[in-house]
Regions:
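Arg/Lys-rich, positively charged N-terminal/basic patches that mediate binding to nucleic acids
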Residues: 1-25
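Enriched for short, Lys/Arg-rich terminal
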Residues: 2-6, 59, 64-93
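Residue-level signal for pocket-adjacent positions within structured domains
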Residues: 1, 39, 43, 77
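A short, surface-exposed loop/turn module that caps and links secondary-structure elements
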Residues: 29-54
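Short, intrinsically disordered, mixed-charge
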Residues: 21, 33-36, 88
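A secondary-structure boundary/capping signal
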Residues: 8, 44-47, 57, 78
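Nucleotide phosphate-binding site architecture
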Residues: 13, 45, 83
């Protein structure tokens, strides 16, 4: 089966580029896992319903399945702040 395509905003590309090499490998492995099986992440609730979150070390990758075979990355960050940051990004959009 063909993997899903990822739509990655420039701000997320830049964040991943600046990560420590070990963490960058983990994030890329997480993204590959999401591309293969988008249901792997935990479904989020309440104001973040429709999004999913995958734990990668101390970081979370927040994403949504946007269309047939397309995944939108929404945010990547530490658990402590990622959900508030995601809400802020969604309200601005």
């Amino acid at each position: 089966m063909e993997p899903y395509r990822l739509r990655v905003p420039g701000r997320i590309e830049e964040l991943v580029r600046r990560l420590h090499p070990g963490l960058k490998r983990k994030v890329r492995a997480g993204l590959d896992l999401i591309r293969t099986d988008p249901t792997v992440g935990k479904e989020l609730r309440d104001e973040l319903a429709g999004l999913r979150s995958l734990r990668v070390g101390k970081l979370r990758i927040v994403y949504r399945v946007a269309a047939k075979r397309l995944i939108d990355l929404v945010a990547i960050g530490p658990r402590r702040t990622i959900y508030q940051e995601t809400l802020r990004l969604l309200r601005r959009a």
